[in-house]
């Protein structure tokens, strides 16, 4: 039986701040050179991204790690890049999906392949997708940046790709998957309608086609997150919008917890509105507001203890409020089928 091989796919657009670290981590993988190849797909960067990628292309020719290739991505967005990479598969058995502002330890792919083979031996069949764990890095930087990093790994702010977990298990939305090429081809690749949430959509379709979709803590990944609360607002609004748009395909893709802020807000408004007619309704509203604030502050305290960063006591609750409001407004905007919000991370991606 042939050894598994990996095509690492890196869609980029104006990633000069992080791409060098990403590519150095990928080129430092312990996986043998003949089992690993790297494709960087540029969506039209206007900064130094292409120059950084080309430098790694040149270095990889005579280096010990995988060969790095740079391709243009006329479609600009992530799903277009990944479908283009799918067409460029040679004899690789798996595709590793990463982004230009993420990086991994040297044994990442080797450990994940070994873990994947062990899991397949246990269940007696091939696995379609195996996700990994995102580990936060709170390094004492800017208050907003540290708060967002902690927030997205917290119980209230982190779910889906940012979820905390241990071991190996079935998952609905695993992060940075190692996909079996055959499984991707089985569902005709990524749906290019979804410029956000395309990986969750892919994994749902892979699972529906009968392939196991799992996650494992056999390795981990670091990712540069938003650096300000204004960019967190933009992220939440954009993600909420596209989640609602994907619900037009299947309502089952929405989760009840995503509507809890709306339920709470409407309950509070009703309580105040009915205070003159229904005894105790105003106290219900005050109870809901106080409970939310208390839980948010408790999460902030726990994250401050976890990261030993006292400013997170206020930063995490503030981030939670911003994330919940922006995501909820995004859901409303998407449900009303209004034009999509702008990309807060890369302005040139808006067209």
Question: What are the residue ranges of the model-derived segments?
Answer:
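A conserved acidic beta->alpha catalytic loop
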Residues: 42-51, 101-105
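Glycine-rich, basic loop-to-helix element that forms the pyrophosphate-binding segment
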Residues: 72-90, 111
């Amino acid at each position: 039986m042939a050894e598994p091989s990996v095509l690492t796919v890196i869609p980029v657009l104006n990633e000069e701040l992080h791409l060098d670290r990403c590519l150095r981590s990928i080129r430092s993988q312990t996986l043998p050179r003949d089992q690993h190849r790297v494709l960087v797909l540029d969506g039209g960067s206007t900064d130094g991204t292409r120059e950084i990628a080309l430098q790694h292309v040149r270095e990889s020719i005579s280096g010990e790690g995988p060969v790095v290739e740079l391709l243009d991505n006329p479609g600009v967005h992530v799903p277009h890049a990944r479908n283009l990479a799918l067409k460029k598969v040679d004899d690789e058995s798996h595709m590793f999906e990463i982004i230009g502002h993420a990086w991994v330890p040297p044994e990442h792919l080797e450990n994940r392949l070994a873990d994947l083979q062990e899991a397949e031996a246990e269940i007696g069949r091939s696995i379609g997708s195996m996700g990994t764990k995102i580990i936060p890095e709170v390094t004492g930087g800017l208050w907003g940046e540290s708060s967002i990093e902690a927030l997205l790994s917290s119980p209230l702010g982190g779910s889906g790709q940012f979820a905390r977990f241990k071991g190996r298990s079935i998952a609905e939305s695993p992060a940075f998957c190692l996909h079996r090429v055959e499984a991707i081809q089985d569902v005709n690749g990524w749906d290019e309608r979804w410029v956000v949430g395309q990986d969750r959509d892919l994994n749902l379709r892979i699972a529906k086609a009968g392939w196991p979709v799992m996650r494992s803590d056999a390795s981990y990944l670091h990712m540069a997150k938003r650096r300000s609360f204004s960019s967190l607002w933009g992220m939440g609004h954009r993600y909420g919008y596209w989640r609602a748009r994907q619900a037009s395909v299947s309502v089952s893709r929405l989760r009840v917890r995503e509507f809890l802020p709306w339920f709470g807000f409407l309950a509070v408004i009703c309580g105040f509105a009915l205070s003159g007619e229904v005894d105790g309704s105003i106290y219900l509203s005050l109870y809901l507001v106080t409970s939310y604030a208390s839980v948010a502050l408790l999460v902030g305290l726990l994250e401050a203890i976890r990261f030993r960063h006292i400013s997170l006591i206020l930063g995490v609750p503030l981030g939670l409020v911003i994330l919940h409001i922006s995501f909820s407004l995004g859901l409303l905007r998407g449900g009303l089928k209004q034009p999509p919000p702008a990309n807060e991370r890369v302005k040139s991606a808006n067209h």
